[in-house]
Amino acid sequence: MSITQERKQKLIKEYAITENDTGSSAVQCAILTERINNLTEHFKFNHKDHTSRRGLLILVGRRRRLLNYIKKNNVSEYLDLISKLGIRKIK
């Protein structure tokens, strides 16, 4: 369910703005998207796991708030990020 340290480092390198950037909004959204995708795969086989489903909803809400922040501050960065992550626009 969780992502490996190697996968997390790869995401950080891919979405980082500078070399030592590990906490920017884009990096956080990428890591949250990876965790959300892993949980979505988990629910295909464990559809009665309601505790993890609540965790999924919390992660989706956190990602939505981060994306709203990015959209408010830099629309072009927001559009680039959602296209790279493969997610839909926020209304």
UniProtKB/Swiss-Prot annotation:
Listed HAMAP family: Ribosomal_uS15_B
The protein, known as: Small ribosomal subunit protein uS15
SMART domains, per database record: Ribosomal_S15
CDD domains in the cross-refs: Ribosomal_S15p_S13e
Taxon lineage: Bacteria, Pseudomonadati, Pseudomonadota, Alphaproteobacteria, Rickettsiales
Keywords: Ribonucleoprotein, Ribosomal protein, RNA-binding, rRNA-binding
Organism annotation: Rickettsia felis (strain ATCC VR-1525 / URRWXCal2)
Subunit structure of this chain's protein: Part of the 30S ribosomal subunit. Forms a bridge to the 50S subunit in the 70S ribosome, contacting the 23S rRNA.
A Pfam family of this chain: Ribosomal_S15
Family indicated by similarity: Belongs to the universal ribosomal protein uS15 family.
Role this protein plays: One of the primary rRNA binding proteins, it binds directly to 16S rRNA where it helps nucleate assembly of the platform of the 30S subunit by binding and bridging several RNA helices of the 16S rRNA. Forms an intersubunit bridge (bridge B4) with the 23S rRNA of the 50S subunit in the ribosome.
Cellular component terms per the entry's GO annotation: cytosolic small ribosomal subunit
GO molecular function: rRNA binding; structural constituent of ribosome
Biological-process GO terms, alphabetical: translation
